[in-house]
Amino acid sequence: MAPLIPGELLPEPGELELNAGRPVTTLSVANSGDRPVQVGSHFHFAEANAALQFDRTAARGQRLDIPAGTAIRFEPGDSRDVNLIPFAGNRRVIGFNGQINGPLDA
């Protein structure tokens, strides 16, 4: 067996399917602003920048269905469909733009 290298990653062979089996909501999003808007993987999408136009009610309690630590950037005038998945765990949303600051299912 080869010696271990500090910090080395030893992934299992094959592919990982992110968020397997989670319900997906697809929404059309448009940036109506004059500056780019970037939204991170775990941001409560309903509270995203006001320049983004989309169904915020449908986005309540959801985040982007993208790998953790990544983001989607919307350039001015850009429009695209995004996939959202529900927050899991205890489903408490604290911070962001302060619109919820508590349980999503209350």
Swiss-Prot record:
It is found in: Cytoplasm. GO terms for cellular component: urease complex. InterPro entries: Urease_beta-like (IPR002019), Urease_betasu_sf (IPR036461), Urease_subunit (IPR050069). Pfam families: Urease_beta. This is Urease subunit beta. Its EC number is 3.5.1.5. The keyword Endoplasmic reticulum does not apply. The keyword Chloroplast does not apply. It is an enzyme of class 3 (hydrolase). Keywords: Cytoplasm, Hydrolase. Heterotrimer of UreA (gamma), UreB (beta) and UreC (alpha) subunits. Three heterotrimers associate to form the active enzyme. Belongs to the urease beta subunit family. Pathway: Nitrogen metabolism; urea degradation; CO(2) and NH(3) from urea (urease route): step 1/1. GO terms for molecular function: urease activity. The gene is ureB. It catalyses: urea + 2 H2O + H(+) = hydrogencarbonate + 2 NH4(+). CDD domains: Urease_beta. One of its GO terms (biological process) is urea catabolic process. PANTHER family: UREASE (PTHR33569:SF1).
